[in-house]
A protein has these predicted regions:
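Active-site nucleophile-adjacent alpha helix/oxyanion-hole segment immediately C-terminal to the catalytic cysteine
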Residues: 1-46
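Structural beta-strand segments of beta-rich domains
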Residues: 210-216
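Conserved active-site-adjacent core of cysteine acyl-enzyme catalytic domains
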Residues: 1, 35-190
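Solvent-exposed serine/threonine-rich low-complexity stretches and specific carbohydrate-binding patches
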Residues: 241-259
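Short proline/glycine-enriched turn/loop motifs at strand-loop junctions of beta-rich domains
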Residues: 220-225
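C-terminal beta-strand-rich structural cap/linker in extracellular carbohydrate-active enzymes
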Residues: 257-282
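Beta-strand signatures of extracellular beta-sandwich domains
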Residues: 226-230
């Protein structure tokens, strides 16, 4: 999936989970600041966003559907079963929040959250040691690529962890796939957001927010048909149907001249901008 890496904030135990959700959300027409992600679970920014704890609460608030890996339903070691689960979601173009140990740290469950965005595989159901996983590690501006056989390790990080900074736990695994937007109308079209900068001004460190330039693309249009692109600056006001009657912030009405339409938008970095595009009148 064409999901560009983004840089996490490091304060308050790190914003890796927030950054991973930010990246996945852009693929579904949603910009959300790392600050807002954490504010959904704790307004004072003290509680981390964690997979298998509160990540789904944030995704649900953003009107995104999700599914977590059922770690309690598999015997240990789980890595191969987990990897097959990740592959199945990536095949369906669903980004996956994956968790990892970090060499030198000590949490018994995991230390870091990253976003898996693609896979090169011989099949899309089971583990194969030669598969290649594409993921954004929330530190590098480049997509990481690792062969499956190099991805996992135990807490001591003495095997694959001796060479790589991040390894998926071998024994117990945690993950959360982002399935798409909540849309009961079944009429909303795919919307993607691309940002011109891979970093977000770190308001936690005292940096002032800025205006981001965003390219908003709508796909699956029918030439000659009329559409409405709704923008919501408050995630609490995003509906799952009846968009025309909703409390949107702005709307662009347009007639499709091709199967894809692109618009340039300005977004305040520490805020929210969520887009829904539907046939006019929906």
């Amino acid at each position: 999936m064409p999901i560009a890496p983004r840089r996490q904030w490091d304060q308050k135990n790190g914003y890796c989970g927030e950054c991973s959700i930010q990246q996945a959300a852009l693929y579904f027409g949603t910009y959300v600041s790392q600050f807002v992600c954490r504010a959904i679970i704790n307004t004072n920014q003290q509680s981390q966003l964690l997979v298998a704890v509160n990540a789904q609460k944030v995704l649900t608030a953003l009107k995104l559907n999700s599914a977590e890996f059922n770690y309690s339903g598999y015997a240990s070691p789980q890595f191969q079963s987990y990897f097959g689960w990740v592959k199945q979601h990536l095949k369906l173009l669903r980004p996956v929040l994956i968790t990892a140990f970090v060499k030198g740290l000590s949490d018994p469950d995991y230390d870091h959250i990253m976003l898996a965005t693609g896979i090169t595989a011989s099949n899309f159901t089971t583990y194969n040691s030669t598969d290649q996983l594409y993921f954004n590690d929330c530190f590098s501006s480049q997509v990481s690529i690792r062969t499956a056989s190099t991805l996992n390790d135990i807490r001591s990080m003495l095997v694959n962890g001796a060479k790589y900074p991040f390894c998926i736990p071998t024994k117990i695994c945690y993950g959360c796939a982002v399935l798409g937007i909540q849309d009961n109308s079944a009429r909303a079209l795919p919307v993607r957001i691309t940002l011109g900068n891979w970093t977000e001004p770190n308001v936690i460190a005292g940096v002032a927010p800025s205006t981001l330039s965003a390219s908003v693309s709508v796909n699956g249009l029918v030439v000659g048909k009329s559409y409405s692109l709704f923008r919501y600056n408050d995630y609490r006001k995003v509906p799952t149907a009846n968009y025309t009657a909703s409390a949107y912030s702005t709307v662009r009405n347009f007639v499709a001249s091709g199967t894809t339409a692109n618009f340039t938008e300005s977004i305040i970095s520490n805020g929210v901008a969520i887009y829904r595009c539907v046939p006019t009148g929906s």
